[in-house]
Regions:
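Sec-dependent bacterial lipoprotein signal peptides
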Residues: 1-20
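Bacterial lipoprotein signal-peptidase II cleavage site
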Residues: 19-31, 40
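Hinge/cleft segment of the Venus flytrap/periplasmic-binding protein
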Residues: 76-138, 269-273, 288-289, 377, ...
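Extracytoplasmic "Venus flytrap"
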Residues: 84-97, 111-129, 139-158, 162, ...
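Flexible loop/hinge segments that line or gate small-molecule binding clefts
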Residues: 98, 204-242, 265, 355-368
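Hydrophobic alpha-helical segments within soluble ligand-binding/sensing domains
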Residues: 127, 134, 236-264, 280, ...
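An alpha-beta-alpha
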Residues: 144, 159, 247-292, 297-299, ...
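Hydrophobic alpha-helical
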Residues: 191, 199-216, 285, 301-361
Length: 433
């Protein structure tokens, strides 16, 4: 599946050009259109931006490689990346992603740095390349923030499957949103002298201890979702502001199509701690309603389905002028969905994430739609990146995976896409879990 959406317009600022230089906005997203880099013919706007960046002298590949070698004891560019055929370059090989500027432009305080200089790429869900072949037997630690929801559980299952396929010894830590537990696991892996670590942070500033220790030990690290502090070799991430915009535009279109005045209250449910994905998703969602002065957007928080249920049930009573709701992640959406049903509410809900109850809610008309992404493809890209890195390849400093808008029109197709060919109707009938 060809990537239909590229990294958000804020990337233009990161690439040292003005926002006005971005491609025209597509309906349903704030992202510019990009094309695969080609060997000849007319330059795309992306290629022109990349050339401007190269010409400006802001990046020095040799200096970057020297710095990387100094920081980790490794050198890049010692081999070709076997996954290149699946990459859509947003920033060319030879450069590193200035992720701190990317997040600062979105209003998130970030000092995180990336060491790899293999550019920035969009990667597909339906990849055509295979896992790289390890040059030797590698031991890799994988710490996942938690596996309570389907996203975390599927990430872990896919990571295990990829490790088994590639012959990687995988050490696993399910941190259950406990940063101290995650730090302790990393400390133990450092003592074991693992070859590399893939890390999905619990606390995006509290993870500094682990990342600093890994750097000091010279152990390569790829983060699954970005940290906000310290540094790593590379990051596998989504363009979360785009997700928020997709969810917001879907809700706004529904309200306008049904003659609802854009006044009153919209509630959205988020997390009670700093999370870069949450901050950028909420920013994207709220930007859709920035021209609605009579509309209040109220944040509610929680970390479980039960907490989000209680918060939404209270909000239904506290805000009689509520016209819509947004679940920023799966537990928030499912909690609101359950509270909506229990209270006989007709409030339209829009969402991010593709857990099975959310897709069922879309099919049944209880959720307008959801900005979704694969929980399996990112694990493949993280493991591929780690193997390539350990093999001596200068990997991309950022892998951006696909966002897809799922509505009632395509929910059955997308259920099969996200769940390995399984059928939504079989899930609803209780024939599959």
């Amino acid at each position: 599946m060809k990537r239909k959406k590229a990294i958000a317009a804020v990337m233009c600022a990161v690439l040292a050009v003005s926002v006005s230089g971005c491609s025209p906005r597509k309906e349903g997203t704030n992202a510019p259109e990009t094309e695969k880099q080609t060997g000849g013919g007319q330059q795309t706007e992306s290629a022109q931006r990349n050339q401007e960046t190269e010409d400006s002298g802001t990046k020095d590949t040799e200096a970057a490689e020297a710095e990387q070698a100094d920081q980790t004891g490794r050198t890049g560019n010692s081999g070709e990346d076997p996954n290149t055929a699946d990459y859509e370059y947003v920033q060319p090989a030879g450069e590193r992603f200035d992720i701190a500027s990317y997040y600062n432009e979105l209003g998130v305080d970030c000092s995180f740095k990336l060491r790899s200089t293999g550019g920035v790429v969009n990667v597909p869900d339906n990849y055509t390349t295979e896992l790289p072949v390890p040059k030797e037997k590698y031991t890799v630690g994988f710490s996942v923030y938690y596996t309570v929801d389907e996203v975390g559980a599927m990430i872990l299952d896919t990571m295990k499957a990829c490790a088994e396929e590639a012959g990687i010894e995988l050490l696993v830590n399910d941190a259950d949103y406990d940063q101290d537990a995650q730090n302790q696991a990393i400390e133990q892996w450092i003592l074991q002298d693992v070859d590399g670590v893939i890390l999905a942070p619990c606390d995006f500033t509290g993870v500094k201890e682990s990342l600093d220790s890994l750097k000091k030990a010279g152990i390569p690290v790829i983060t699954f979702n970005p940290a906000l502090v310290s540094e790593a070799d590379s990051v596998v991430m989504s363009e979360c502001k785009e997700q928020g915009v997709m969810a917001g535009e879907l809700l706004r279109k529904y309200l306008e199509d049904n003659g609802t005045e854009l006044k009153g209250t919209i509630v959205y449910q988020s997390l009670p701690f700093v999370h870069p994905n949450a901050a950028t998703r909420s920013d994207g969602f709220k930007s859709v309603f920035a021209d609605c002065p009579d509309l209040d957007i109220v944040e509610l928080t929680g970390t479980s389905i039960e907490e989000h249920y209680a918060a939404f049930e209270s909000a239904l009573m506290a805000y009689p002028d509520m016209i819509g709701a947004f679940g920023l992640y799966s537990a928030a959406t499912v909690g609101m969905l359950n509270a909506k049903a229990a209270n006989g509410s007709g409030i339209p809900i829009t969402s991010i994430d593709n857990d099975k109850p959310i897709l069922q809610g879309i099919y049944e008309g209880n959720i307008l739609g959801s900005a979704c992404y694969s929980s399996t493809a990112p694990a493949f890209w993280a493991m591929s990146g780690m193997i390539n890195l350990l093999n001596g390849v200068d990997i991309p400093s950022a892998y951006f995976y696909e966002n897809q808008l799922v509505t009632k029109e395509n929910v059955e197709e997308m259920f099969e896409h996200y769940y390995g060919g399984k059928k939504l109707k079989d899930y609803m009938a209780g024939e599959i879990q």
